[in-house]
């Protein structure tokens, strides 16, 4: 019998404490809020919106998947549009940071980097871009979590695009699409 060493084969990773820390930011939710004037581009009006998000876990908990739908209205109640987003996030062990990918029904696709700062989860697009986004989940008040979207143009100051108050929703009360 020959004593030969077998090659070590890579094994799938398992979720660590970083995913446990991330998990509390991704419950199924509904929300209402506002979109700032110029938030959807120069000259766009102020709007209101309501939406919903449902989350699941992928690859034995290594990734969190979010599917979101939001209806937007002019301040007089006139329907403007329905926006949908598919989001996948988790701990990137190699980069030692949270990473997320997003795709929406308007043809946008992006990659974001994230971090947890106390009760806030913050994702940003990379620094080198002329238009940067920052998404923040703020659980400082656990009874009234807030989600915000901000934009930074060519290194200028961050400007609020939209802000929403979230409420927990049962998994079967939220539908994707």
Give the positions of each predicted feature.
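Hydrophobic small-molecule pocket/channel-lining residues, especially in calycin-type beta-barrels
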Residues: 1-177
């Amino acid at each position: 019998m020959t004593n030969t060493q077998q090659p070590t084969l890579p094994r799938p990773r398992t979720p660590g404490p970083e995913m446990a820390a991330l998990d509390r930011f991704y419950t199924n939710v509904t929300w209402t809020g506002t979109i700032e004037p110029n938030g959807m581009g120069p000259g766009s009006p102020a709007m209101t919106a309501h939406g919903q998000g449902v989350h699941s876990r992928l690859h034995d908990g290594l990734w969190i998947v979010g599917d979101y739908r939001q209806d937007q209205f002019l301040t007089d109640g006139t329907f403007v549009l329905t926006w949908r987003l598919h989001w996948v996030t988790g701990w990137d062990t190699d980069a030692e940071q949270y990473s997320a990918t997003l795709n929406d029904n308007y043809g946008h696709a992006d990659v974001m980097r994230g971090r947890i700062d106390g009760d806030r989860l913050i994702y940003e697009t990379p620094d080198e871009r002329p238009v940067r986004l920052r998404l923040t989940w703020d659980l400082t008040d656990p009874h009234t979590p807030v989600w915000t979207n901000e934009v930074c143009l060519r290194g200028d100051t961050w400007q609020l695009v939209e802000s929403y108050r979230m409420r927990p929703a049962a998994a079967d009360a939220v539908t994707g699409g």
